[in-house]
Amino acid sequence: MRLTVELIQNSLSYINPLKDRELDLRGHKIPTIENLGIAKDQDAIDFTDNDISSLGNFPFFPRLHTLLLARNRVKHIQPTIASTIPNLTTLVLTANNMAELADLDPLRNLTRLTHLVLLENPVTRKEHYRYWVIWRIPSVRFLDYQKVKDAERAKAKELFGTAEEPTALASKIMGIKSRTFDVPSGGAERAPADKAVRVKLTEKERKRVEKMIREARSLQEITRLEKELNEGRIPGGALDAGEDSEDENQMQT
């Protein structure tokens, strides 16, 4: 069922036990977040038990601080999510499809995010999962309902360094993302934010991209490579075309 204006208007909006105004959108098999501009002045939105695959496409909601999305299909988070819901403090993503540690990167810009739940996602089985989230999203104080300890923060820093000088392990993890990238923001009017463009890489191009990320000398260089991929562009040094032209020249000689 689409998240239509009519569905939002007919859904229950109430003051919950925490004295927050909450919009109940549970259990409608909603595939895409859309039309939320009509749902003004909400403190919390409950999307539990739907079919949402991408977390994004929110209007500017400075008041929203709690999102409940357990038992959906979320596998992608819009990189610009922090610009639309900047005051989010609690995000529950239990039983979704987040797969890679680097797929969580957009959450690092939610500087008020203190409570994060990722239980029953494939990403939780990754090595160093908890330390990575603690390092990459330092605002988080409770991860999967467990308080983040100072010793864990120290261990995370030991493993991954700092944002300015990440370790080789951190750089490697930042380069491994699911093969789905955001459509450029310029196309937002033509396509919902949850739709994505897949960058089709040959095996050689994929290996070159991974090598470029491993050999990157700064976080800024890694960010540039990520941006090119997010925009649907293959980084210049990874293109097969140059190699093909060399092969053609050799054949002609």
From Swiss-Prot:
Residues 228-253 are annotated as: Disordered. The keyword Plastid does not apply. Signal peptide: none annotated. GO terms for cellular component: post-mRNA release spliceosomal complex; U2 snRNP. Keywords: Leucine-rich repeat, mRNA processing, mRNA splicing, Nucleus, Repeat, Spliceosome. Residues 241-253 have a biased composition (Acidic residues). LRR repeats lie at residues 19-40, 41-62, 63-84, 87-108. Pfam families: LRR_9. Belongs to the U2 small nuclear ribonucleoprotein A family. Associated with the spliceosome. This is U2 small nuclear ribonucleoprotein A'.
